[in-house]
Amino acid sequence: MARIAGIDLPKKKKIEYALPYIYGIGLTTSRKILKDTGIDPEKRVYELTEDEVSILNKEIQSNYIVEGELRKIVQLNIKELMDLGCYRGLRHRRGLPVRGQRTKTNARTRKGKRKTVGAKAK
């Protein structure tokens, strides 16, 4: 099993589709990495040689921010928005949708389970 950027890639998948298992690498980036390194995208992960794995590792480590480092940067960006007190930061703080979605109905994923409100007494 090839271990790239601290992630074990699935053996039987083509390398082109296995690289996106790494946080921060999508299909487009995966294709770009393979083109830059000259590795055949049709190759399966178990077919990679040690040299190819090390080339991929070097390429990703030197040119891309992935996994834990990227997660930390994203969290810091969200924290900065919250500290600034801007609209997006307030939405993050309140646990509501950030990108302008409606909240009268829907938004259950972001808001969590429904809170039952008692009926008013007359």
UniProtKB/Swiss-Prot annotation:
Question: One matching Pfam family, short form?
Answer: Ribosomal_S13
- The superkingdom of the source organism is Bacteria
- Keywords on this record? Ribonucleoprotein, Ribosomal protein, RNA-binding, rRNA-binding, tRNA-binding
- InterPro entries associated with the record: Rbsml_uS13_C (IPR027437), Ribosomal_uS13 (IPR001892), Ribosomal_uS13-like_H2TH (IPR010979), Ribosomal_uS13_bac-type (IPR019980), Ribosomal_uS13_CS (IPR018269)
- From the UniProt record, which GO molecular function terms apply? rRNA binding; structural constituent of ribosome; tRNA binding
Keyword Ribonucleoprotein annotated: yes
One GO BP annotation here? translation
Q: Where is this region: Disordered?
A: 98-122
Name the Gene3D superfamilies on file.
1.10.8.50, 30s ribosomal protein s13, domain 2 (4.10.910.10)
**Keyword NAD in annotation:** no
Question: Quaternary form?
Answer: Part of the 30S ribosomal subunit. Forms a loose heterodimer with protein S19. Forms two bridges to the 50S subunit in the 70S ribosome.
Q: Which family does it belong to?
A: Belongs to the universal ribosomal protein uS13 family.
Give the function comment from the record.
Located at the top of the head of the 30S subunit, it contacts several helices of the 16S rRNA. In the 70S ribosome it contacts the 23S rRNA (bridge B1a) and protein L5 of the 50S subunit (bridge B1b), connecting the 2 subunits; these bridges are implicated in subunit movement. Contacts the tRNAs in the A and P-sites.
**HAMAP family given for it?**
Ribosomal_uS13 (MF_01315)
- Name of the molecule in the record: Small ribosomal subunit protein uS13
Organism name: Nautilia profundicola (strain ATCC BAA-1463 / DSM 18972 / AmH)
Q: Print the organism lineage.
A: Bacteria, Pseudomonadati, Campylobacterota, Epsilonproteobacteria, Nautiliales
